[in-house]
Amino acid sequence: MSRLQFQLQATDGAARRGQLSFPCGTVQTPAFMPVGTYGAVKGVLPGQLCDLGAEIILGNTFHLFLRPGLEVIADHGGLHGFMRWNGPILTDSGGFQVFSLAHRRKISEQGVTFAAPTDGAQVFLGPEESMKIQKVLNSDIVMIFDECTPYPATEDVARDSMELSLRWAQRSRDAHDALDNDAALFGIIQGGVHPDLRGRSLDGLQAIGFDGYGIGGLAVGESESERNVILEYLHPRVPADRPRYLMGVGRPEDLVESVARGVDMFDCVMPTRHARNGQYFTGFGTVKIRNACYARDVDPIEPGCGCPACVGGYTRAYLRHLDRCNEMLASMLGTLHNLWYYETLMANMRAAITAGTFFAFRRSFYLARGLDLPPLPEVAGCAG
């Protein structure tokens, strides 16, 4: 039996408010997971992540397998002990990272052979290997090994990729069970931008049986409208008692629009990566701190923000100075701010869903940015 319990607590249109429960903690949904690729969220201590509102984080199977290797992590009893994070952890399967290697990989029925980006050594990764690695990592949510469908792709290419991922899904399920791993196992819905293929993928995954469903193969170059069509198609079809995880999508607008279409979980490197590049998220848009207009600006990043950078009184002028001097404090403060913004955005959406005011929240979200309210189709209960 899986260590995960999911409770759907409220809905407002297609937007869902729920809770993931694990022995090591609970996660309120919709939830955003900071990304700890190498076993750390860049520039942030685990205790700080808790203070920012993060309840679950993501670790990267592919990169942790290559560095430091499973033996080192096993010496610490798993990823929780290795990185000193006591809350739930989701690990991806490595499929997307292998996909990103492009010409350095060879895909077969058995799995993927690739040149390791660390030293060029030939490495093989398949469903069984991915499940064994994630067992050692001892994560709370394990993702199946899949092929990320490229974009653009013809329907034939997308179909072949989806069908391969379904065969790998069955092998992932079998290997996970054989390892007697009580972590939750999520399937991953593939099929590119073709709704009928997404439906066939979901049907196949449901026949196998999973604790939750990732929506993969997005955030790879498709348009926002193409992505939304897929989410609108899937919302009434994914079992309501299973969490839905949109993988790798992370602009604030994307989070709001995806929650409006029934998504429960997100991860993205955007808040941390953008902070390292001098871009800070706020309720009125993005502050690009390298712009000259901030050279003598004595305001915090966002007046009224409760993050350590803003509460601490660090001004835009100071942050711009640090950024121009390549001081690591700029990235650290910016990361704290951006993660606070993301976690607060999720908390505000949860509160709005509970109160039945999500669509008013959505309107005010765009109004504060000076943007037009995007259309929300009157299908599948999405529109309020």
From Swiss-Prot:
UniProt entry keywords in alphabetical sequence: Glycosyltransferase, Metal-binding, Queuosine biosynthesis, Transferase, tRNA processing, Zinc
Cofactor note: Binds 1 zinc ion per subunit.
GO cellular component: cytosol
Binding site for Zn(2+): 305, 307, 310, 337
Top-rank EC class of the record's enzyme: transferase
Catalytic residues as annotated in Swiss-Prot or TrEMBL: 92, 267
InterPro entries documented for this protein: ArchSynthase1/Queuine_TRR, TGT, TGT-like_sf, tRNA_ribo_trans-like
EC number of this enzyme: 2.4.2.29
Required cofactor names: Zn(2+)
Molecular function terms, GO-annotated: metal ion binding; tRNA-guanosine(34) queuine transglycosylase activity
UniProt catalytic activity: 7-aminomethyl-7-carbaguanine + guanosine(34) in tRNA = 7-aminomethyl-7-carbaguanosine(34) in tRNA + guanine
Pathway info: tRNA modification; tRNA-queuosine biosynthesis
Binding site for substrate: 92-96, 146, 190, 217
Annotated region described as RNA binding, given as residue ranges: 248-254, 272-276
Gene Ontology biological process terms in this record: queuosine biosynthetic process; tRNA wobble guanine modification; tRNA-guanine transglycosylation
Alphabetized Gene3D superfamilies for the sequence: Queuine tRNA-ribosyltransferase-like (3.20.20.105)
Similarity section: Belongs to the queuine tRNA-ribosyltransferase family.
Job of this protein: Catalyzes the base-exchange of a guanine (G) residue with the queuine precursor 7-aminomethyl-7-deazaguanine (PreQ1) at position 34 (anticodon wobble position) in tRNAs with GU(N) anticodons (tRNA-Asp, -Asn, -His and -Tyr). Catalysis occurs through a double-displacement mechanism. The nucleophile active site attacks the C1' of nucleotide 34 to detach the guanine base from the RNA, forming a covalent enzyme-RNA intermediate. The proton acceptor active site deprotonates the incoming PreQ1, allowing a nucleophilic attack on the C1' of the ribose to form the product.
Subunit (UniProt): Homodimer. Within each dimer, one monomer is responsible for RNA recognition and catalysis, while the other monomer binds to the replacement base PreQ1.
Name the UniProt record assigns to this protein: Queuine tRNA-ribosyltransferase
Protein's organism: Xylella fastidiosa (strain 9a5c)
Gene name of this polypeptide: tgt
